[in-house]
């Protein structure tokens, strides 16, 4: 296998290099980017969940949880990434886009994913308490809705889980 450097646009005017084999950006590569964004949230004392939206090998939207800093229960990583992506392309319909998020989306975010017409969802760790894409509920797999054609969990799920567990361990230690 050949390894080569691939430059991808992560935001307008911002590029990053991804080392990959055979020139393909893997789901794990994209999830690593979402994990990096989640880490930024952790540094800002937010629950470390990060999300990116990819269209034609470019990140067109990203976000991390900001519920605490914005005093907004809807400021989840997925919601902020969807808003950013919609603003980037000038359309609320995110057809042919993939969402990478470090934790299984909740019911609110699953509804937004369906409503925004996102084609593929890849998430890190499962959420047995609030997950709505296979754990507690399966909104994204419900044939009643026009759901994403691909829903895949456990993409670097262990890394996502460790990040979240580390955050809550440190929070409890402060108390």
Model-flagged regions — what are they?
Residues 34, 38-41, 51, 61, ...:
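Small-residue (primarily alanine) positions within well-ordered alpha-helices
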Residues 16-44, 105-175:
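Zinc-dependent deaminase
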Residues 2-5:
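Basic polycationic patches enriched in arginine
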Residues 49-57:
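Short beta-strand scaffold segments in enzyme catalytic cores
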């Amino acid at each position: 296998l050949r390894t080569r450097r691939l430059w991808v646009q992560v935001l307008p005017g911002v590029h990053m290099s991804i080392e990959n084999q055979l020139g393909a950006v893997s789901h794990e590569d994209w999830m690593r980017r979402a994990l990096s964004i989640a880490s930024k949230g952790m540094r800002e004392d937010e629950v470390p969940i990060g999300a990116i939206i990819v269209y034609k090998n470019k990140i067109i939207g990203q976000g991390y949880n900001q519920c605490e800093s914005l005093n907004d229960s809807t400021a989840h990583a997925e919601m902020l990434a969807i808003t950013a992506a919609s603003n980037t392309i000038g359309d609320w319909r995110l057809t042919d886009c993939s969402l990478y998020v470090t934790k299984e989306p909740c019911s609110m975010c699953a509804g937004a994913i369906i409503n925004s017409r996102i084609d593929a969802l890849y998430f890190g760790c499962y959420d047995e308490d609030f997950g709505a894409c296979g754990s507690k509920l399966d909104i994204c797999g419900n044939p009643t809705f026009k759901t994403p054609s691909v829903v895949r969990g456990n993409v670097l799920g262990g890394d996502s889980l460790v990040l979240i567990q580390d955050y809550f361990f440190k929070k409890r230690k402060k108390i």
